[in-house]
Amino acid sequence: MKILIVGSDLNAFLLAKYIKIQDSSHDIYLTTEETCVDESYTPIHIRENDVPSICDFVKYNQIEFTIATSQLAIINGIADIFKKEGFPIFAPFSEAARITFFNSIAKKIMYKLKINTPKFGIFDRENLALEYVRRSRFPIVIENDFNLLSRESTIYKTYSEAKLGLQKVFENGNEKIVIENYIETEPLYIYFITDGFNALPLVTIERTSGENFSVSASPSNKITENILVKILKQAIYPLLDDISKFAGGYTGIIGLKVKLVKDTFAILEFYNGFQYYDFQTFISLSEENIVDILYSAANGSLADDYDFIQHKEDFSYTVAVNKTEVLDYLEDTDFIQSEDSEKLIFTNTASTMTYAKNILLDYIQDVCTKDVYSRIIQAESKKELRI
C-alpha cells in the first residue's frame, strides 16, 4: 500500500518506522524538510499546512491512505478536503478537532453534556478574570485557551501569585484564558481510537516530570476496567455523538488528561493524537497491525473489525531525557529508542513493571549524568510514597 504520513514530528517518524517494521511491503512517504536519514520512508518536501499541494501529491501519486499527525494540517482542514475528494485519511475534521485546540470549547461542551470536569471560568478580559480569582478557593489553575503544540498551565497557591500570573498570560497575547479549580491528585492519560461513532481504548499512562526529564509507565493500575467503562459511557460516547451533529464526526485518536476523584473521574482536557512520547509507549505494548487499525477507523468500520485492541501481557516504562544530560548514547540496545531535537527517549518492556523500570534505570544510570539520574530516582520515590 502507498501511505502518506503528513507530519514531521517525532510521532510521524516513529509511525513510519513502525509501519515498515510490521510490513516492509508498504511504500511510505513523509512530509519533512529533512533529507531522508531512514530507509523506512521517502521524504516529501511539502509544508504541512499546504493542504492543496498535499492533496495534489496524493492524487498524482495514487496514494492509497493518508495519516495526518500534523496539528497544522488538521487545523487547516486536511480531513475536510480529503473527504470531499474521496481520499481515505485518518484525521479528524478541523471543526471536530477544535475541542483539542481550544480548551474553552472543550469546557463548554463538557458543561453542556454534564461530563465531569473541574469547576471553571472562561475570560477574555483581565479585570473579570481577576475578580473571579479573588473569589476563588486556592490553589487554582490558569491556562491559555489555544493549544496547537502545547498548553501553558500553571498552578497558583495565593491571590498575589495568581494576579501576577494573569497579567503575564494576557501580556503574552492570549485573547482568552481558562481558570479552573485544582484537584489534588496526579493526572493520568488515556488514549482512544475512534471512527466517529465507536471508540476503543488504546493505552493508559502515568507520568512523572522533572527538570530535564519525564517518565511514563503503562498500563496504569489506577485506571480500572470500571473507570474505563465509565469514561466511555459518560464522556467519550456523548462527546462523539455531540460532535457528529455539528462537525461531521471525530475520526482519529483522542487523548484525555484525567484525574481520579474517589470512585469517579474528572477530565481536564482533550488531546488530538498522542502527546509527549506516548506513541512510543503504545507501540511497545500493542500487538495489532497499526495500518489495519487506522484504516478501519478511517473507513468507519472500527466496531465491525475490532472488539478490542490486543496488547502484550507486558508493562512499559519510558524515560525521556534532555540530550544535554546524556553522556554516552548506545544505539545497539534492547530498548526502543528515539529522539527529537531536545530529548532522547528510551522504552523498556517486561513482564512486571518493577523489572521494566529497574532494567531501564540501570541503563539510564550508565549513560546519563548523575544529577538527572538522582532527580529521576527522587521523583519515582515520591510517587511510590504517594501510592
What are these regions (language model features)?
Residues 43-53, 121-125, 155-157:
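Short acidic-hydrophobic, aromatic-tinged amphipathic segments that line or gate anion-handling sites
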Residues 232-255, 271-330:
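Active-site "cap" helix and flanking loop/linker of ATP-utilizing ligase/carboxylase catalytic domains
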Residues 90-153, 159:
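A conserved helix-loop-beta module that forms one wall/lid of the active-site cleft
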Residues 58-63, 135-136, 173:
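Glycine-rich phosphate-binding loop signature in dinucleotide/nucleotide-binding domains
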Residues 152-275:
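Internal nucleotide-binding/catalytic subdomain
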Residues 295-387:
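Peripheral (often C-terminal) accessory segments that flank ATP-dependent C-N-forming ligase machineries
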